[in-house]
């Protein structure tokens, strides 16, 4: 069976709340770390989310 092309990553809030989203990423096509501006319900604002490893 072949290795899957996509991996799961964690998008961690930079507000320091510990809130995160889980997303898929193809590491062969997207080599840089992902950054998104998404909603953090803990602080009730849109903040920057950065890629982190799922442990």
Curated annotation (Swiss-Prot):
An annotated Gene Ontology molecular function: structural constituent of ribosome
Coiled-coil annotated residue ranges, if any: none
Gene3D superfamilies noted in UniProt: Ribosomal protein L33 (2.20.28.120)
Superkingdom of origin: Bacteria
Keywords in alphabetical order: Ribonucleoprotein, Ribosomal protein
Cellular component terms per the entry's GO annotation: cytoplasm; large ribosomal subunit
GO biological process, one term: translation
Family matches, as Pfam families: Ribosomal_L33 (PF00471)
SUPFAM superfamilies: Zn-binding ribosomal proteins (SSF57829)
Family: Belongs to the bacterial ribosomal protein bL33 family.
HAMAP family hit by this protein: Ribosomal_bL33
Entry protein name: Large ribosomal subunit protein bL33
Gene field: rpmG
